[in-house]
């Protein structure tokens, strides 16, 4: 982890930026960006993972990703099967059955599943991590020390980041398989057409862009809750769930908008 994490100096900030709301917002967001960069460097650095940190990270991954995977995958598959059936029946009634599967893949797998997975992880394990860190910070815990930062912040970041990636990819693959079964049934005769369709949808531009979006969603969900450690103890004790979730939602919307512009313009 870098030697210095960009923690706030509230007294100085209030003196220098009083009466300048825009400057305060810019300073707060720049501090958040520096903190996010430092946190990601720590999370991807092998030197961070001492034995206690590895154990805490394994527990975080188990809670955030592994325990959530069966239920989330089941719900995604059921929703995908229902959506595929509705779209296929509706498209057939208009003579557009050849477009049904493509619509499901483009809308559900590429657009909806990554966003739903990000929100699911944020509400399930992100809020849990936020509450624990907020309670520690409210009691005056100093997360600027490397040991505390590595042991209490990095495991949650790694767990949430991997959870978003794992849930999105696993549910996406399962939905692709279920969509084929809903339209073609248990038969191999549609595999050639379906494989060609999936290859056309995930072209050399769409596939890496989708992976980039999933990764950015994962980073946003991983970093946003732990930014509570930047708050003063008094501010952390006042309740920060709405503020953190609002920032996370804005980040997800900004990422989605940037990806749509990259794909379609």
Segments and roles (model prediction):
Residues 11-57:
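Short, membrane-interfacial amphipathic segments enriched in basic
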Residues 65, 69, 73, 149-174, ...:
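Selective transmembrane-helix segments that form parts of the transport pathway or gating/packing helices
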Residues 68-89, 251-258:
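Hydrophobic alpha-helical transmembrane segments of multi-pass membrane transport/permease proteins
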Residues 73, 90-129:
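Membrane-embedded or membrane-proximal helical elements that form or frame transporter/channel pores
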Residues 85, 89, 119-135, 222, ...:
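Short helix-terminus and kink motifs of transmembrane alpha helices
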Residues 86-109, 170-215, 219, 223-243, ...:
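Membrane-interfacial helix-loop-helix connectors in multipass membrane proteins
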Residues 131-157, 237:
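Short cytoplasmic-facing helical segments at TM-TM junctions of multi-pass membrane proteins
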Residues 237, 241-261:
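Final/C-terminal transmembrane alpha-helix of multipass membrane proteins
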């Amino acid at each position: 982890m870098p030697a210095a994490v960009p923690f706030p100096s509230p007294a100085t900030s209030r003196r220098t930026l009083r009466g300048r709301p825009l400057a305060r917002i810019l300073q707060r967001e720049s501090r958040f960006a520096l903190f996010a960069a430092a946190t990601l460097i720590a999370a991807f650095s092998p030197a961070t993972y001492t034995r206690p940190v590895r154990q805490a990270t394994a527990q975080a991954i188990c809670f955030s990703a592994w325990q959530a995977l069966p239920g989330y995958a089941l719900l995604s598959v059921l929703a995908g099967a229902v959506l595929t059936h509705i779209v296929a029946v509706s498209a057939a009634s208009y003579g557009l059955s050849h477009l049904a599967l493509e619509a499901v893949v483009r809308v559900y797998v590429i657009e909806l599943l990554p966003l739903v997975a990000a929100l699911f992880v944020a509400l399930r394990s992100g809020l849990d991590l936020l509450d624990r860190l907020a309670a520690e910070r409210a009691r005056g815990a100093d997360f600027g020390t490397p040991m505390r930062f590595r042991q209490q912040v990095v495991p949650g970041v790694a767990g949430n980041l991997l959870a978003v990636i794992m849930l999105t990819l696993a549910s996406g693959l399962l939905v692709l398989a279920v969509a084929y079964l809903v339209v073609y049934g248990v038969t191999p005769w549609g595999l050639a057409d379906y494989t060609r369709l999936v290859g056309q949808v995930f072209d050399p531009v769409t596939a890496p862009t989708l992976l980039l979006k999933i990764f950015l969603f994962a980073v946003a969900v991983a970093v946003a809750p732990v930014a509570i450690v930047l708050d003063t103890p008094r501010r952390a004790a006042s309740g920060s769930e709405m503020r953190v979730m609002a920032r996370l939602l804005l980040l997800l919307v900004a990422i989605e908008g940037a990806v749509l512009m990259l794909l379609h313009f």
